[in-house]
Amino acid sequence: KRIILEENRPIVMAVNKPVGMVSTMSDPEGRPTLADLVADYPERLYHVGRLDIDTSGLLLLTNDGELANRLTHPSYEIPKTYIARVHGEVKPGVRRRLLEGVELEDGPIAVDSFRTMETYGDITTVEIIVHEGRNRLVRRLMDEVGYPVRELVRTKFGPIRLEHLQPGTMRRVKGPQLAALYDAVGL
């Protein structure tokens, strides 16, 4: 088991990005950005992937470029877990279709996992796990199978969980979680 010393290790922060914030460090339109969250942080941090402006949840920031590259490269197949609230009661055949793969305008895609969590009225909550990071992927997948996303939250990125982070806050990833993140990409 590897031990990472506090003063020698790179910085990895888990952020709960709120809806309405863009996943960049600057925005020409003046919208809230990730830079607003880390403005007082002594190190320069880079976002690992993105979440669209209408999606909330877990986003990682780091000063380790190699870690960021590996976490976002499809060959490492790092799973990302989303909870989506969609319109309608999801039919049983949708799971099979998503697991087998659907054709999107930028190529075929299959989810790693799909499960229905609950249905209340005309809203169904589903969990979707994918390892690719295409633009608005979960929203486009659910549109393709006929269930538009009403609300989308990323709850897990590899071994890192959102946990109880409030929107617009962050925590440092440490100890076993940090080691698991590096192990996931062979570093």
Task: Identify the meaning behind each predicted range.
Residues 1-187:
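Basic, flexible Lys/Arg- and Gly-enriched helix-loop patches that mediate nucleic-acid binding at interfaces
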